[in-house]
Each structure stands twice: as structure tokens, then as C-alpha cells.
Amino acid sequence: MNKDNLIENYAVALFNNAMVDNIQDKIFEEITAINRIIIDNFDIREFLFSPIVNKDDKINVVNSLVKNTKFNKIVNNFLLLLVKNSRTAILSNIVDAYNTLLYESKNIKIVQVISANKLQPKEQEWIKSRIEKELNQKTEILFDIDSTIIGGIIIKYDSMLQDYSIKGSLDKITKALKKVRIAA
């Protein structure tokens, strides 16, 4: 099974368990918090991700951690499952996939907008309203910065890519010029 399918399977399983009790948002908050703890704490991350550390030791540590938390039992069991199956390294990917499922269940499309510089709130609102109008759907916009695009924006959602960047335009011009034959 490839990594993307594996991630999707774990995310779907977690989401389906959350749906039983109608606590999808709560589970997302909790799994995101756990992921943040692991990302922010070098010692915990190294311990959980290390192939050298005995799996039983990892399970014992996670068991003691989850007993002292107020996280939902679904989250605790899910974390233990990841440890038992040596899948803690893909937790961040699972959280992202779960987030996508959560938005899809609310009929909200996740859209990534990349700009060369940080956009002002008014610019972000304008872009969001234009995208929602074009898609005829509510959106969750993730604004990212990539100075290599020089200017303009790139919009990504699903398998679509709309490149309105200066770099993209220059790349198209370069490609077109390479095809031109100059007669001597």
C-alpha cells in the first residue's frame, strides 16, 4: 500500500469513528493539539519516531501520557494504534487528510493561495470572495508566501492550478521563445 493510501485510510477511520458521536470538530482539535506537542517537543518526537526505541516502551509512555490527558478516548486509542503500527511519523499527514475530510463534510473547499509577499487582510478578503464566487462554494483559504514567484498569485485546489504569477508568465514566455526558430 502506498503512503498516500495509508494516510487516507487512517484519516478516514478516525473521521468515521468521530462521526459516530458527531464530534468531528472536537477530534480534529485534539489530534491537532497532539500533533503540535510532538512537533514542538524534540525529545518526544525523537522518542516516538526512533526505530531504535522498543515499541513496547513507546506504548507504555503513550499509555501513561493519555491516561493523564482529557483527550477523547477515540484520540487516545488512535494514538496508541499509530504507535503499535509504527506510524507516528505520518501523524502530521493524517491530521492534514482529516482536516480535508472535515471541510469536505461541511461542503467547504480548501484552497491554497501563494503570493510573493504577505497579503493585507483586505486583499485576502477580496481574493477569498472572488474564489468563492468562481467556485460557487464556501472556501477555507490557506495563504502562503513564496518569494520566488516574484509577484502575482498562484491558486491551488483539488488538482487545479491557476498560475497568475510573474514567474509563471516568464516561464511561459521562455518556453515559447525556445520553440521559435530564427531564419538566417
Curated annotation (Swiss-Prot):
Pfam families in the cross-refs: OSCP
Disulfide bonds: none
GO molecular function: proton-transporting ATP synthase activity, rotational mechanism
The keyword Cell inner membrane appears for this protein: yes
Domain of life (superkingdom): Bacteria
InterPro entries (alphabetical): ATP_synth_OSCP/delta_N_sf, ATPase_OSCP/dsu
GO cellular component terms given for this protein: plasma membrane; proton-transporting ATP synthase complex
Compartments, record wording: Cell inner membrane
Membrane-topology annotation of the record: Peripheral membrane protein
Keywords assigned by UniProt, alphabetized: ATP synthesis, Cell inner membrane, Cell membrane, CF(1), Hydrogen ion transport, Ion transport, Membrane, Transport
Ion transport as UniProt keyword: yes
Main localization of the protein described in the UniProt heading: membrane
PANTHER family documented for this protein: ATP SYNTHASE DELTA CHAIN
Family, as annotated: Belongs to the ATPase delta chain family.
NCBIfam families in the cross-refs: ATP_synt_delta
HAMAP family: ATP_synth_delta_bact
Functional description taken from the UniProt entry: F(1)F(0) ATP synthase produces ATP from ADP in the presence of a proton or sodium gradient. F-type ATPases consist of two structural domains, F(1) containing the extramembraneous catalytic core and F(0) containing the membrane proton channel, linked together by a central stalk and a peripheral stalk. During catalysis, ATP synthesis in the catalytic domain of F(1) is coupled via a rotary mechanism of the central stalk subunits to proton translocation. This protein is part of the stalk that links CF(0) to CF(1). It either transmits conformational changes from CF(0) to CF(1) or is implicated in proton conduction.
Subunit structure: F-type ATPases have 2 components, F(1) - the catalytic core - and F(0) - the membrane proton channel. F(1) has five subunits: alpha(3), beta(3), gamma(1), delta(1), epsilon(1). F(0) has three main subunits: a(1), b(2) and c(10-14). The alpha and beta chains form an alternating ring which encloses part of the gamma chain. F(1) is attached to F(0) by a central stalk formed by the gamma and epsilon chains, while a peripheral stalk is formed by the delta and b chains.
Name of this protein: ATP synthase subunit delta
UniProt source species: Rickettsia felis (strain ATCC VR-1525 / URRWXCal2) (Rickettsia azadi)
The encoding gene: atpH
